[in-house]
């Protein structure tokens, strides 16, 4: 785990979807609720956390019709109801106005090999392990990920919450950037991500 500016991390990652956004004429935006700050330092595993967002965003683009909207938002929060590591957290929300998910199957999407079954997926099959991988990686970050349908019935809302700070991490999990060089960009990260569900 390394201390990273999550704002820059998300911006770099979103650029990899610019072509898809243009091709489907999808409005793709990033909103920050950081009380005027332009950056937010968090501790993440730079070799794996990109897979979490790439999997969720890939599904958002897959199931959002042409001319639709996909929004990524970032904020921080505090909740005493959470276990100690998550009392102070940062949250990444990914919201689309796509086809949504059957409310009776919404929890199943994180199960290994589960695939959504609808008209849009008949010619667009995936492996069924993308979101399962995302949940596993989020849990390794001591966080939570959940999905819900939007209250207006127009699409899906994914919520990813991870702890702020590094007190929840073991000493051997912390990486010193001075020992490994400068902070890598998304283009330098491993390309073995699994993007589909």
What are these regions (language model features)?
Residues 142-148:
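Glycine-rich ATP-binding loops of the HATPase_c
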Residues 101-113:
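Short conserved segment of the HATPase_c
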Residues 60-61:
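Short helix-loop "hinge" at the ATP-lid/N-box region of the Bergerat-fold HATPase_c
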Residues 125, 130, 134:
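Short alpha-helical Gxxx[C/S/T] motif in the catalytic ATP-binding
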Residues 19, 99-100:
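Glycine-rich G1-box
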Residues 37-44:
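Conserved micro-motifs of the catalytic ATP-binding
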Residues 2-15, 27, 50:
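A conserved beta-strand-to-alpha-helix junction within the catalytic ATP-binding
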């Amino acid at each position: 785990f390394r201390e990273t500016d999550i704002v820059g991390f998300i911006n770099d990652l979103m650029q990899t979807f610019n072509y898809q956004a243009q091709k489907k004429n999808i409005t793709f935006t990033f909103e920050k609720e950081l009380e005027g700050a332009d950056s937010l330092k968090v501790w993440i595993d730079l070799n794996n956390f990109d897979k979490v967002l790439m999997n969720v965003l890939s599904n958002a683009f897959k199931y959002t019709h042409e001319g639709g909207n996909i929004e990524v938002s970032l904020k921080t929060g505090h909740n005493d109801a959470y276990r100690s590591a998550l009392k102070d957290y940062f949250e990444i929300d990914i919201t689309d106005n796509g086809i949504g998910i059957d409310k009776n199957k919404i929890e199943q999407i994180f199960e290994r090999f589960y695939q959504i079954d609808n008209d849009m997926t008949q010619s667009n099959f995936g492996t069924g392990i993308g979101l399962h991988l995302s949940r596993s990686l989020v849990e390794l970050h001591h966080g939570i990920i959940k999905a819900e349908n939007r209250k207006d019935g127009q699409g899906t809302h994914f919520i990813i919450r991870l702890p702020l700070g590094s007190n929840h991490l073991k000493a051997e999990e912390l990486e010193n950037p001075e020992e490994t060089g400068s902070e890598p960009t998304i283009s330098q990260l491993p390309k073995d991500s699994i993007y589909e569900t």
